[in-house]
A protein has these predicted regions:
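Phosphate/diphosphate ligand-binding glycine-rich loop within oxidoreductases
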Residues: 2-107, 246-247, 256
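Glycine-rich adenosine-cofactor-binding loop
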Residues: 8, 90-96, 103-107, 152-173
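Rossmann-like NAD(P)-binding element
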Residues: 197-220
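Active-site capping/gating segments
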Residues: 101, 105, 256-288
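ADP-ribose/adenylate-binding Rossmann-like module
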Residues: 81, 226-264
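Intrinsic disorder/low-complexity segments
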Residues: 108-152
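NAD(P)-binding Rossmann-fold cofactor-contacting core
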Residues: 174-193
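Short glycine-/small-residue-rich Rossmann-like dinucleotide-binding loops
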Residues: 57, 208-213, 238-239
Length: 289
């Protein structure tokens, strides 16, 4: 029987085991491989598991272990999914795939396009909140660059450039978006410091917030930082203790907020099919959330 799990720290709060159980009705084992040391956790994967999900703070270290990189993984420099294959350990990035799926749901210009798998088929009916009712194929048709002109000129602000932030930036770039990067630690001229948050927020049509706590600069936002004619689309990665959810409600129709549980669901739905080779039950997965 195949065996799967999650490595990272801390992960006791993770919804992944419940999501995985719902996805396949308890057919497969899925363990939390808790530990602060990456090498110890990775060794357990090699010795005991067929494939694993990877979460913070191990995404970059896991990327370095891979023998084979999927296209989306190569574009991010991080992985959240390692699979044993006859050719070696293959790395994927379903954070990337989940963001592309979210963008396809919330961005009007993407209607009729099927990222992250252009050859798949979209379910006609949706659950409340726009959740797709079924998983799509995980095989790529063509290159990630096939849709690079689709959202040219759309500005997206990525706040926080850890593993999830890198994936979000790469996914946005693959659709031709103008990506504004921001991080606590600024390592290059293409990355803005947090002090620039309000200025960059004003410019952006879409904001993906990946920092696990509220930054002081959030308090400076006012109605004047939003567009009059079109709401800003906001995705927050942290679903356990969100910083923006209540704040964005105060701006009414000027902001459309999406919680991290949707990103979690979309990356899980794409990732679990890669792990197992079987389509997950999205309806049961969404019930967990």
């Amino acid at each position: 029987m195949k065996k799967f799990g999650l490595i990272g720290h801390p992960i006791a709060h993770s919804l992944s085991p419940a999501l995985f159980k719902a996805a396949y009705d308890g057919k497969y084992a899925y363990d939390l491989i808790e530990g602060e040391d990456f090498e110890t956790s990775y060794r357990r994967f090699i010795e005991e598991y067929d494939a694993i999900n990877v979460t913070a703070p191990f995404k970059e270290a896991a990327f370095a272990k891979a023998d084979i990189l999927s296209e989306e993984c190569a574009s991010t420099g991080a992985t959240n999914l390692l699979v044993k294959t006859p050719e070696g350990i293959k790395a994927y990035n379903s954070d990337f795939l989940g963001v592309r799926m979210w963008l396809s749901e919330v961005t009007e210009d993407l209607k009729g396009v099927l990222p992250p798998w252009p050859q798949g088929s979209r379910a006609n009916s949706k659950q409340p909140g726009g959740l797709l009712q079924r998983a799509a194929p995980t095989e790529w048709a063509g290159s990630l660059s096939d849709h690079q002109s689709l959202l040219k000129g759309v500005k997206i602000l990525i706040v926080g450039l850890g593993g999830a932030g890198k994936a979000a930036a790469a996914a946005a770039e693959s659709l031709g978006m103008d990506v504004i990067r921001m991080n606590r630690t600024v390592r290059d001229s293409q990355t803005h410091p947090l002090d620039d948050f309000r200025k960059c927020f004003r410019k952006a049509n879409i904001i993906i917030y990946n920092i696990p706590a509220a930054i002081p600069e959030l308090k400076d936002l006012t109605d004047s930082d939003f567009n009059e004619d079109k709401p800003k689309l906001i995705l927050e990665a942290n679903y356990k203790d969100p910083s923006l959810r209540e704040m964005m409600k105060s701006f009414g129709s000027k902001a459309v907020y999406t919680g991290g549980e949707i990103w979690l669901l979309y990356q899980a739905m794409t990732g679990y099919e890669i792990l197992t080779g079987e389509k997950p039950d999205l309806t049961k997965m969404s019930d967990v959330l």
